[in-house]
Amino acid sequence: MPHSPCLLWLLAVTSLVPGTQPLVAGDLEGDELDETPLPAVPCDYDHCRHLQVPCQELQRAGPAACLCPGLSSALQPPHPPRLGEVRVEADMGRAEVHWCAPSSPVNQYWLLLWEGGGAPQKGPSFNSTVRRAELKGLNPGGAYVVCVVAANDAGESRAPGPGAEGLDSADGPNLGPCGRLTVPPRPLTLLHAAMGVGSALALLSCSALVWHFCLRQRWGCPRRGRPSHAGL
């Protein structure tokens, strides 16, 4: 059967071009697989990690794209942070406060401290990477309420203070920005108190003894009657 002139011409051109190989269907499939992008993974971001690099910087610095947690609008004040562990050092009169970042854009944090029913004391501001801070100058035996506040260009998060709900709840961890803080008395203070109580008891005992002897000297002691001898 005679071949078509066009087909013969195509075969001739293919054989004349050096390095030309016929296309194989498997090669096309391999090229398509190589160009398929890998699925994105979550960024190494922890809301509670101290000195945590912002997630947007992790996206730019990483070799591959990663996913950041969703955030609220930057045009709104941030959601309240979540207060974490509070470690008290009674000997030093200080406490270390830990918190977790909210799912909101944050520029800075600070702590508010209430003692009794007085006005809150505002601590220094910390940048958005900080998740841990110290409270100093706490009184031994004092009771406080501490709140974490987050702020951005649109405003600051709400800090209910001593009137917050769930401060005294024992059902589970505190999920709000505030918590109660109690500083136990120092060991030396307890020792001094014990010595004071012991001294007071000793003084009271001595006073009772002196009073007893004074009464004996004043009224005299009752004399016992001599025993009567019966018979010779």
UniProtKB/Swiss-Prot annotation:
- InterPro entries listed in its UniProt record: FN3_dom, FN3_sf, Ig-like_fold
Which residue intervals define the domain Fibronectin type-III in the entry? 77-172
* Alphabetical keyword list: Glycoprotein, Membrane, Signal, Transmembrane, Transmembrane helix
Q: Quick check: keyword tRNA processing in the entry?
A: no
Query: Which residues, if any, are the signal sequence?
Result: 1-22
| An annotated GO cellular component | membrane
User: Which residues does the entry place in the Cytoplasmic compartment?
Assistant: 211-232
Predominant location: membrane
* Glycosylation, residue list: 127
Q: Give residue ranges on the Extracellular side.
A: 23-189
Asked whether the keyword Transmembrane helix is assigned, the reply is yes
Q: Which residues cross the membrane?
A: 190-210
> Per its UniProt record, what SUPFAM superfamilies does this chain match?
Fibronectin type III (SSF49265)
State the membrane topology: Single-pass type I membrane protein
The listed locations are:
Membrane
Pfam short name (any one): fn3
Protein name in UniProt:
LRRN4 C-terminal-like protein
